[in-house]
From Swiss-Prot:
GO terms for biological process: cap snatching; DNA-templated transcription; symbiont-mediated suppression of host gene expression; symbiont-mediated suppression of host mRNA transcription via inhibition of RNA polymerase II activity; viral RNA genome replication; viral translational frameshifting. The gene is PA. Binds 2 manganese ions per subunit. This is Polymerase acidic protein. Mn(2+) 1 binds at residues 41, 108, 119-120.
Length: 716
């Protein structure tokens, strides 16, 4: 075939085709059918434009003899055959000069007479099938499509064939000749059968080098090459008897399909061990705020100024002492660090003008807490690759932890309403398209249900902390910058409020890669006595730093105020996602919206108003050992939001794995509930995949225990 291509096509076309294939990492010597197809396509594009000119009046002219009149300009701009960068440059300049909409994919030609891009297709299959594939791929009304086949058929958008009869006949004749030439050499059949559907970029993505070798090594038995295997998979129609299909795939496989009955599934095994501990980047239900209402001080909105103002609202400071040490840390350093923060804030107040930011002195306690000079020295790989026993040092398996009750309490708290509003109506973002009345109505109802929710407070707190930390990490790479943890809200009466939760001190932050870590020390106010659930606070050193007067039903009571201090770390990519936590609002809104849609399709009318305003109706919220929990529509909105927020706050590889694997078991159980008689093979393997994600993460363990409640009730 390669020899035929080189004989049959003009050398310039052959050279262009080779360049195109190399650009995609394909070899013309191996993928000879593709080589032939590219040459054919190039030739058709050139023939399409040959001899067609436009005169000064914009009229189309066909000139076949020698040198055309200098006043004529080519009717078609050829884009196909240029390298990608050049091709896009041409497309962009055409769009800029003519105002034509820019296409998503590179077209083949531009027609100056009709002012449109043209996509040329040459197919060995039915023209209409290929036409639909092309149209489906480019999804643009503006690009004109023209398909030719080797049998002389053609098809074009709106049956507008652009060229005169004779020019098209030339193209069809040439295609017919190519087909006959191939047939006479016994090449046509293989060429005809090798045509795949319209390829998207993903399908063009060729595997080369090491990956290619690995792919070839890991082929199932009985397959000689990756192409062979791909062709088999593409042609695999997944219907009919599964066992038969499996045995047809390989002699090695003998899967017995076991029926999945109510008695089949067992509960997930949760790990034993000490209770799991809190691992969020900031305190959740245990956080305490020092607040100012209607802030109007000088420098309002500058975090450091706001923080100092909030600190001044509290008068119960006392000499700090450690009430719950951190098992592994040097606890006096945490105490010294807090005293240093207080001292340096005092220094600032004595200055004439409060600065916008504060960099902490690099004391020994902060250097220790922030891991300064602790990173192992980096050595160039070149210098040590000759060391014979070079290996990565062993890391310990993570210690297994059992589910503790605090994480369910955290979740319940996140679903509750607070007495402040944390988002304005437009926080979810205006839709770009003109919103239909229904969509904005749904959004307003949803926002009303969640604006006062504690999970929404966590979103705004997370967005603020991550934004401030990422900014400081870039702006003050070498400094130990003091970053107040602040949030803003509105009271029931609509008054603005600024809250201070505590402080963060950031370590050195030369973050080159997304995953490079910046260390920080967090110091957060709380009224929670850590001695009640010491296992929850394993990673913290807790100080008692003051006494707070609280108004209660029986009058004022004094409660000790604690400071939860710990060393922590994050990375650019984690901060980027933290800054985007508002997406949780959108995700849960979409989930609620699909419930409204389901209700509306049953009633055959929009049920938005009834859905949100019928306070008597209850909806399933989740599973607990008691059974299916139900609640109002507001509770549903807040629970879905809290789940989304916790997925963000407690994001981890364990959660990724658990979500993906448990979903498979969930689908099987749902199929059983729908009487679809599901069958499974290697159910033990699926349980193994789920349970290897249950190690020590509190949120994953809680989800696993919910999953067990679901299994129990679903199979009753």
């Amino acid at each position: 075939m390669e020899e035929f291509v080189r004989q049959c096509f003009n050398p310039m076309i052959v050279e262009l085709a080779e360049k195109t294939m190399k650009e995609y990492g394909e070899d013309p010597k191996i993928e000879t059918n593709k080589f032939a197809a590219i040459c054919t396509h190039l030739e058709v594009c050139f023939m399409y434009s040959d001899f067609h000119f436009i005169d000064e009046r914009g009229e189309s002219k066909i000139v076949e003899s020698g040198d055309p009149n200098a006043l004529l300009k080519h009717r078609f701009e050829i884009i196909e055959g240029r390298d990608r960068t050049m091709a896009w440059t041409v497309v962009n300049s055409i769009c800029n000069t003519t105002g034509v909409e820019k296409p998503k994919f590179l077209p083949d030609l531009y027609d100056y007479k009709e002012n449109r891009f043209i996509e040329i297709g040459v197919t060995r299959r039915e023209v209409h099938i290929y036409y639909l594939e092309k149209a489906n791929k480019i999804k643009s009304e503006k690009t004109h499509i023209h398909i030719f086949s080797f049998t002389g058929e053609e098809m074009a958008t709106k049956a507008d064939y652009t060229l005169d009869e004779e020019s098209r006949a030339r193209i069809k004749t040439r295609l017919f000749t190519i087909r006959q030439e191939m047939a006479s050499r016994g090449l046509w059949d293989s060429f005809r059968q090798s045509e795949r559907g319209e390829e998207t970029i993903e399908e063009r993505f060729e595997i080369t080098g090491t990956m290619r070798r690995l792919a070839e090594q890991s082929l199932p038995p009985n397959f000689s090459s990756l192409e062979n295997f791909r062709a088999y998979v593409d042609g695999f129609k997944p219907n009919g008897c599964i066992e038969g299909k499996l045995s047809q795939m390989s002699k090695e496989v003998n899967a017995r399909i076991e029926p999945f009955l109510k008695t089949t599934p067992r509960p997930l095994r949760l790990p034993d061990g000490p209770p799991c501990s809190q691992r969020s980047k900031f305190l959740l239900m245990d956080a305490l705020k020092l607040s100012i209402e209607d802030p109007s001080h000088e420098g309002e909105g500058i975090p450091l100024h706001d923080a100092i103002k909030c600190m001044k609202t509290f008068f119960g400071w006392k000499e700090p002492n450690i009430v719950k040490p951190h098992e592994k840390g040097i606890n006096p350093n945490y105490l010294l660090a807090w005293n240093q923060v207080l001292a340096e804030l005092k220094d600032i107040e004595n200055e004439e003008k409060i600065p916008k930011t504060k960099n902490m002195k690099k004391t020994s306690q902060l250097k220790w807490a922030l891991g300064e000079n602790m990173a192992p020295e980096k050595v160039d790989f070149e210098d040590c690759k000759d060391i014979s026993d070079l290996k990565q040092y062993d890391s310990d398996e993570p210690e297994q932890r059992s589910l503790a009750s605090w994480i369910q309490s955290e979740f319940n708290k996140a679903c509750e309403l607070t007495d402040s509003g944390w988002i304005e109506l437009d926080e979810i973002g205006e839709d770009v398209a003109p919103i239909e009345h229904i969509a904005s109505m749904r959004r307003n109802y949803f926002t009303a249900e969640v604006s006062h929710c504690r999970a929404t407070e966590y979103i705004m707190k997370g967005v603020y902390i991550n934004t401030a930390l990422l900014n400081a990490s870039c702006a003050a790479m070498d400094d130990f910058q003091l970053i107040p943890m602040i949030s803003k809200c509105r009271t029931k009466e609509g008054r603005r409020k600024t809250n201070l939760y505590g402080f963060i001190i950031k370590g050195r932050s030369h973050l080159r890669n997304d995953t490079d870590v910046v260390n920080f020390v967090s110091m957060e106010f709380s009224l929670t006595d850590p001695r009640l659930e010491p296992h929850k606070w394993e990673k913290y050193c807790v100080l008692e730093i003051g006494d707070m007067l609280l108004r209660t039903a029986i009058g004022q009571v004094s409660r000790p105020m604690f400071l939860y201090v710990r060393t922590n770390g994050t990375s650019k990519i984690k901060m980027k996602w933290g800054m985007e936590m508002r997406r949780c609002l959108l995700q849960s809104l979409q989930q609620v919206e699909s419930m409204v849609e389901a209700e509306s399709s049953v009633k055959e009318k929009d049920m938005t108003k009834e859905f949100f305003e019928n306070k008597s109706k209850t909806w399933p919220i989740g599973e607990s050992p008691k059974g299916v929990e139900e609640g109002s529509i507001g509770k549903v909105c807040r629970t879905l939001l809290a789940k989304s927020v916790f997925n963000s706050l407690y994001a981890s590889p364990q959660l990724e794995g658990f979500s993906a694997e448990s979903r498979k078991l969930l689908l099987i159980v749902q199929a059983l509930r729908d009487n679809l008689e599901p069958g499974t093979f290697d159910l033990g393997g699926l349980y193994g995949a789920i349970e290897e994600c249950l190690i020590n993460d509190p949120w994953v363990l809680l989800n696993a225990s919910w999953f067990n409640s679901f299994l129990t009730h679903a199979l009753k």
